[in-house]
Each structure stands twice: as structure tokens, then as C-alpha cells.
Amino acid sequence: TFMILADADEPLITHIPGFDGYLTVRFNTNAEIWRDREIFRYHPSFIDAIEVQYPTSPAESFVLKVANKDQVSIANGKGEMVKGNVNADFLRSYLDSYMNIQYENIIQLAPSTRDSVLVPQNLLATITVVNKEGAQKSIQIFKRYWNGRAFVNKGTEVEFDQDRVFVVINQKVVANGQYRTFNKLIVRYQDFTNPPIQPKN
């Protein structure tokens, strides 16, 4: 396979050791394939605030304000501060989850398709992260539905994909994402508190 570098006068023979065949498939010219799949990559010390909103369960929504790794305030969807003991291990693990969140691939939806699948009743959560410099990134997570196409789960047809979701990044880019990735982020306000200590008999 011949390849020519930018500003080069002559092409070069390109070889991958152990590979026999055309290299075209290894060097795709579609820019979306080469695009960084990063959505969130924040060390906890660079996070100023995280807001997670659940349209169908506002009581489970929450806002985290991060002063530093040892000082994080937690409020519910009504702005009420957390009551009870904070589960520090869970909180620390949750903040660490934002260090590496990626989508699977970019998808192009026709306007008619977009209007029928990215609908309010399919919206699972909206997550907004603000860094220490005030820059904001927001995503919307939708149940993955495709115009009546049936998904199969353990031999049974279901309306929504059980493995993947649609992710809308900054209200522009639409991507496929995996539940196993985003389940780390879509936790409940109540998960940040330790269960009450039961008195000993």
C-alpha cells in the first residue's frame, strides 16, 4: 500500500508487520472514526460542580459542589442540603468516575428520526459538569429507541435497547453509549448517605 505524507513529493510504501493485505481499512479517512471519544475527563480536583437531573424522579436529582476533595456539599433537586451521614467512599468513587467517560461512536440521525427518538419521555437524565475555570459540559442520556425497531433481551423482544443509550453532548452531537459506562453517573441523591445506624438490642 502506498501512502503520501502532507507536503511530501513522493509516496512511501507502507507496511504493518504481520499484516498481509490492503491497509486502506486501517487508515479510514472518515474524521469521526479518528475523533477522541472523550465526554468527561475530569480529575476530582478540577471539578467545581456536578448537577444530575432526573425528569421523572426529581427527588433523586442532586447537585454536588466541590470545594476540594475533602469538602463536598450535596443538595437534592429542591436545593435542600443532605441530611445524615455522607457515605465518603461512595462520594469519592463517584467523583473518580468522571475521570474517564467515553461514548461508543457518533451517529447521524435524520431530523425526522431525531425528533421521534430524542423525545422527553425517553430522557433518562441530564448531567452538567462545571470545572474550576467555569467551563461547562452537559449531556442528555436517552433510552435507545429506534422507530419501532424491536430489541431482543434474553430471547424476548423489548421496546428499548438494554445495553446502549443515546447520548446528546452539549445539545449537538449524538452518540451511542453503554449503560455499563453511564450507570456509574446516574445514581440517586439518596445513594450519597449512609443508612441510619440501627440501635443494638
Per-segment meaning from a language model:
Residues 1-201:
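Soluble, acidic/polar mature domains that operate outside membranes
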